[in-house]
Structure formats: structure tokens, C-alpha cells
A protein has these predicted regions:
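Alpha-helical membrane and juxtamembrane elements of multi-pass inner-membrane transport
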Residues: 1, 151-155
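Small-residue-rich helix-interface/hinge motifs
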Residues: 2-139
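Short, membrane-interfacial amphipathic segments enriched in basic
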Residues: 142-151
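Pore domain of cation channels
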Residues: 156-165
Length: 165
């Protein structure tokens, strides 16, 4: 019983922490792609997204692939960085509009909310945030106005420290 109380208490703290990042990102008009309580490898217990004014909810649904496609060379082969990792680029507006109507990636302006199934932590996926798994020099496109990396230093700082406020 005490482990349930611990998980509940930590979950509340994580949600409040991630809401801090979320709120500051939205204040500065940065897209937040996902907001999750708990981690969700492979699938999520609950996923929800507001599309055209209506909430769509899915239970026990597999995760949506990121809106990224491999960067190709002139021969049609995947480009790789110096470490041999594939390079990706964001989907173009035309590629996004070509997705089926039911594909949530077609609606990048709204946040996907969810509950994962691994009860450790949570996350807030902010558009254009370059983390330790990415190299900013390998990003092929110019920063978009709604991306984290396009914001002033003080705005990025507010978004980062928003989790502790």
C-alpha cells in the first residue's frame, strides 16, 4: 500500500513539474508535441488529442511515429552523420497533409496528452528542443517560429526552469 502512495505522490510532483515547462512553452508560443505522465515505450494506456475542436481518445494504443522522415542523398540513400546515425528532417506541410485524416501527426498544433504504462516520471516533448541525443549542427532546417530553438535565450531559460517554479 505504501508503494502506491509513493507512486501517487511522485506522479503528482512530476505532473506539476512538467506543467511548469508546458505553461512557459505555451506562453512563448512554442509547440508542445506531447505531455505524458509515466513513460510509454511501444504503447500508451491512454492517449488524447483535441482535433478540430473535438477530443479524440485512444486506449491501449501504440505510439505515433514522430513527424520526421529520413534525410536522403541524391541516390535515395539515407544520409548518416559521422557516427553512422541516420539524419532526419521534419515533414513538409505537403507530406503532413498527405497523411490519412485519422493520423494525429496531421494536426501538429495541438498537444497529445497521455498516460504511459511505466510508472517512472513523465515528459513534455517540446518542438525544436535539442537534447543530448541530438546534435544541433546536423539539423537540416532553419528553426521555425514555433520551435524552442528559435526563441531568445531568456525565453528558453524560462521554459527550462519553468519546471521548478
Amino acid at each position: 500500500m505504501q508503494w502506491l502512495q509513493l507512486i501517487l505522490a511522485l506522479s503528482i510532483l512530476v505532473v506539476i513539474h512538467e506543467l511548469g515547462h508546458f505553461c512557459f512553452a505555451r506562453i512563448f508560443k512554442v509547440r508542445v508535441e506531447k505531455f505524458y505522465m509515466f513513460f510509454n515505450p511501444k504503447f500508451s494506456l491512454v492517449r488524447a488529442k483535441k482535433i478540430n475542436g473535438k477530443w479524440q481518445i485512444k486506449f491501449f494504443a501504440s505510439n505515433v511515429e514522430p513527424s520526421m522522415v529520413p534525410l536522403l542523398d541524391a541516390m535515395g540513400n539515407e544520409k548518416k552523420d559521422e557516427k553512422g546515425q541516420p539524419l532526419y528532417r521534419p515533414m513538409t506541410d505537403e507530406e503532413i497533409q498527405a497523411l490519412p485524416q485519422e493520423d494525429w501527426r496531421r494536426y501538429p498544433d495541438s498537444t497529445e496528452w497521455g498516460i504511459g504504462w511505466v510508472p517512472f516520471g513523465g515528459y513534455c516533448a517540446i518542438a525544436g528542443m535539442v537534447d543530448e541525443t541530438k546534435d544541433a549542427t546536423n539539423l537540416p532546417s532553419e528553426p521555425q517560429p514555433w520551435e524552442f530553438r528559435s526563441k531568445n535565450v531568456w525565453q528558453r531559460l524560462c521554459i527550462i526552469i519553468g519546471g521548478i517554479l
